[in-house]
């Protein structure tokens, strides 16, 4: 799902940083994104060239590379321990002004928001699958989600 989310944002002209612990995942992600973009391009010749879109996506195995991000969207497997580890590491590097979202469909947004120092900047941002095709995203507030956070994601 993370590849599709990265593709959606890159297609909207955002520079995207993808983090994973495995370099092998990146090869799969690159291939999946390029294939998807080529299919979309064949259906709509007016669309931007796939290479230009995929060039906006960078891949990192060092989470410190995300320190300058304004938005972080977690899309790990639905395993609370994995999500907890990601948010714990993320808490030490992101700016206090960064927004944090989870693509979860299983866990409480309020519970996940407690894993970062700024729960008011945390939200659920659940993409339907596949993200590049399904133009539907659930925006889910937690108990501590600030209205500015909700408004920001609603307008994305």
Residues covered by each model-derived region:
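A structural alpha-helix within SAM-dependent methyltransferase catalytic domains
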Residues: 7-10, 67, 91, 113, ...
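Short amphipathic alpha-helical segments
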Residues: 6, 30-31, 84-87, 112-114
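Residues at the starts of beta-strands that form the adenosine-phosphate
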Residues: 15, 56, 121
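Rossmann-like NAD(P)-binding element
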Residues: 21-28, 39-99, 107
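Rossmann-fold dinucleotide-binding core
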Residues: 102-156
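Buried hydrophobic positions in well-ordered alpha/beta secondary-structure cores of metabolic enzymes
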Residues: 1, 57, 72-75, 101, ...
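NAD(P)+-binding Rossmann beta1-loop-alpha1 motif at the extreme N-terminus of oxidoreductases
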Residues: 1-36
